[in-house]
A protein has these predicted regions:
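Proteins synthesized as precursors that undergo proteolytic processing into mature forms
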Residues: 1-69
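In a subset of proteins, long, contiguous C-terminal domains/tails are tracked
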Residues: 48-100
Length: 100
């Protein structure tokens, strides 16, 4: 999401709704700390060209449902110039963003 906001200029809601990927090369937190080098899950909404490019680079790509990456976020961004808060609610999980 950070890259979508900073590098691509998406607002917080657009960034949280964007197609997501999840790599498995880094060891997991729970015991026995499994790692799956070069394995990556991608949501089906990701461009087929990107999926092909990942495969061509040797990744083992698993395409999951259109909203299949199940880690949800409710991000908040604060504009340092105005002090205005911007939030997003992730459709992958039951979430809502409220402010007052």
């Amino acid at each position: 999401m950070f890259t979508n906001i900073v590098d691509f200029g998406l607002n917080v809601q657009e960034a949280v709704e964007a197609p997501r990927f999840c790599g498995s090369s880094f060891p997991q937190s729970p015991w026995p700390h499994r790692a799956y080098p070069n394995r990556v899950q991608v949501e089906a909404r990701l461009s087929p060209a990107v999926i092909e490019a990942l495969n061509a680079r040797g990744h083992q790509v698993e395409v999951v449902g259109p909203w299949g990456i199940r880690n949800g976020f409710a991000p908040i961004l604060v504009n340092p110039e105005t002090g205005v808060y911007h939030g997003g609610a992730d459709p992958r999980k039951e979430s809502v963003m409220l402010g007052w």
